[in-house]
Amino acid sequence: MGAPARKRASLLLLLLATMALVSSPGWSFSQGTPATFGPVFEEQPVGLLFPEESAEDQVTLACRARASPPATYRWKMNGTEMNLEPGSRHQLMGGNLVIMSPTKAQDAGVYQCLASNPVGTVVSKEAVLRFGFLQEFSKEERDPVKTHEGWGVMLPCNPPAHYPGLSYRWLLNEFPNFIPTDGRHFVSQTTGNLYIARTNASDLGNYSCLATSHLDFSTKSVFSKFAQLNLAAEDPRLFAPSIKARFPPETYALVGQQVTLECFAFGNPVPRIKWRKVDGSLSPQWGTAEPTLQIPSVSFEDEGTYECEAENSKGRDTVQGRIIVQAQPEWLKVISDTEADIGSNLRWGCAAAGKPRPMVRWLRNGEPLASQNRVEVLAGDLRFSKLNLEDSGMYQCVAENKHGTIYASAELAVQALAPDFRQNPVRRLIPAARGGEISIPCQPRAAPKATILWSKGTEILGNSTRVTVTLDGTLIIRNISRSDEGKYTCFAENFMGKANSTGILSVRDATKITLAPSSADINVGDNLTLQCHASHDPTMDLTFTWTLDDFPVDFDKPGGHYRRASVKETIGDLTILNAQLRHGGTYTCMAQTVVDGASKEATVLVRGPPGPPGGVVVRDIGDTTVQLSWSRGFDNHSPIAKYTLQARTPPSGKWKQVRTNPVNIEGNAETAQVLGLMPWMDYEFRVSASNILGTGEPSGPSSRIRTKEAVPSVAPSGLSGGGGAPGELTINWTPMSREYQNGDGFGYLLSFRRQGSSSWQTARVPGADTQYFVYSNDSIHPYTPFEVKIRSYNRRGDGPESLTAIVYSAEEEPKVAPAKVWAKGSSSSEMNVSWEPVLQDMNGILLGYEIRYWKAGDKEAAADRVRTAGLDSSARVTGLYPNTKYHVTVRAYNRAGTGPASPSADAMTMKPPPRRPPGNISWTFSSSSLSLKWDPVVPLRNESTVTGYKMLYQNDLQPTPMLHLTSKNWIEIPVPEDIGHALVQIRTTGPGGDGIPAEVHIVRNGGTSMMVESSAVRPAHPGPVFSCMVILMLAGCQRL
């Protein structure tokens, strides 16, 4: 007997011996043991920056892994395993490492956590513990810094020793008077130095550098000694920019980091800063007119050369540097937990990206893995041949470059298992359709893979025209008939053992389509019903499914277009509501039971607006015209009638219809000329097609093109000016936007002359963003009118000239002081000031007067100032101290500044009013009036006299309060009979002003009585405030 025959006989004996056991009612399967798995990190240590001066007495590095059985933990410092004994400074709490009383000398370094259980060991990513510090500034006095007013200056910070980097601010004279970040001042966050582009008198003073360290646990700031900035006589000359704060020629950055380039220049006028990317374009989200260029999250696309340009009317200066972008390792492909059969081969692979390119190595149970025997290590590949049980364990792929290290972990479980059907037995009942085909899988759990054999009853099945056993053990029976019913058993065997599983095949009637859907043509927006009816085996449930071009139709989508018929189980009609172009195609109706199915197709054609044209190409580019061509898109079953062309430019980004030649573009055209474009402008174009059913989606945008240059066609606007230093004519205008520049090399051409003069002077000002020009000449008198015109130019020529505007040269301060200044206190907190006005002079337009006042005994430098908003010759000054003598001067002012001071005048404010309100209020009531009486208020020696009393009265019928004055300590006021309540306030008045009020609240009680509530309140807010309440009752004319 041959080997195949012996094997078949052996399996037959196994079949006969086990069939009774399989069918025995006492047969059962025991449950598997609880799953075990190796450590998987849930929390890994992260780097810490610990302040050397911290009050904290410990540092915790976290580590936690999920594992079964639970993991145990070890730690390494700088690659050496740590001795974590009880009572030492290093304690293990769970998986966390706690370092007590950390110091830089003993504890700074690289830490790793190791988690282990019987399955294997994994190591965590590395965590670096660093120690931060910030020392104090030197106690030595700083030398004064001297320069000329109008020059630029740099004040060095010279920060103390520190780690890591700092942030910087500067103080002027006192805290918290911080130097603002504006176009004239700049604080370098690289060096801490303070730069002033052009100094002026307001910069005089003492400066201190404030350095701040931001650590993980705390923030610390230190101040430098003050350094005095002294300014020599002003140098009125203009200077071209000179860049003083420069970014380095090369700046390295990691992907995702923020990159900051610094650039600041000295110059007069103050230079404007502009940034550009030499070999690309800047993101619109980045600030491009600031001393710093910040890239919030740098990417490889941001690598390149960047240029900073500082420009003013006297010239320009530039600096360039390159940003080089690198990256930490990042996984492209990682390993995953794997179960493999004993004796099989396995190939694991991992791949990482990074710059520089990462190196890859492997660990097994936390130890380096090298090629040996059956294991081959090839960079990112790990290969096993003929796996055995000892290969099980925890594996890690490690990718590293100079910027970091990453770990990918996986468990390898090598299995040796006898065939086992407990998790995946053969189906007990296997229904099949007559005339159809059935596949019965046999997939026992086994390692190595089991040999499969099938039987029907006691007959071993082999391959035939109707029966096939596939390589994976699946039994396939075709053209099924009633004779195929019965028990089918799958036998599985490997060197570990044998097993089998049985199922019963039951043959049912086939499913058929009795009414198939019909093809149809519809328009967009129409409704359509596709019919589909079927017959089936009555013992089974029937379901209908629909597909469109082999994709399932979604009936449950909210707001969808499909509805399903639900009249009868054998009817599966599909209705399309408000059909769209995307609903056209081949629909398939499938009627299915659990054993078989039948299907029929129908084609739905949906007519609609045309699809987008394609291939939009721009050629024959002129200054205001281009020629467009395109290819026809789908007409969607309705002829194209016409085309519409649109364009957009970068400034607006909005698509607008353009003029064309021909004006109306017919449906058979594939080219047209675009008219009326702007010269030297970037454009994108798109094309839309229309038919009788509407206009379709536009084409994709064309490639961006730039029209040719032309002479500017529009004059600049907003011509004005004035101001500046003596001897200067400052001319301002509105910079022309990109769409009106018409070409490169753009700038402005100014013409100006003294009013009445015959000859014009000209000045050429480069730069589209320039918005002012300063002409300096010592011969220019203050506030001299000039006639000014402006035009723009580019490299193609000069544009049209604007209308003439009158601009005045810089004003000078008034030369004459006001005379006959008089001042007198009008209350305890106010005084009146008057003066004889000065005449308008030729130095400028007088805007008003500045009143300076200070207390006797103080210096004039401490004076407060108020300005009039017009040319009034008197004013009231408020907010003064009571019973205080003040000195007062008055000066005229214009836009250039204030003139000389008048001789000082003196004024004495009044004593304050009495702080006591009127008390002991009594009353007499009649039907139409209320008489109130109170004790006279006697002022103290430090209070002003009382000349009378003010009474403020308001009732619910009269929302506007009425003021009554009396020089006596009583008053009678009318009280309408129909009021509900009224409010009365009584206070003293006199030379020192009004005193604190006593408030009386009157509420009518019935027809003949009212209640009076009295309280003394401070006049802090307008609403009624009640305290120290006194309640009186008014009843007829009697006093209680």
UniProtKB/Swiss-Prot annotation:
Pfam families: fn3, I-set, Ig_3. Residues 1015-1040 form a propeptide. Its main location: membrane. A lipid is attached at S1014 (GPI-anchor amidated serine). It is a lipid-anchor; GPI-anchor. InterPro entries: Contactin-1_2_Ig1, FN3_dom, FN3_sf, Ig-like_dom, Ig-like_dom_sf, Ig-like_fold, Ig_I-set, Ig_sub. In conjunction with another transmembrane protein, CNTNAP2, contributes to the organization of axonal domains at nodes of Ranvier by maintaining voltage-gated potassium channels at the juxtaparanodal region. This is Contactin-2. It comes from Mus musculus (Mouse). The gene is Cntn2.
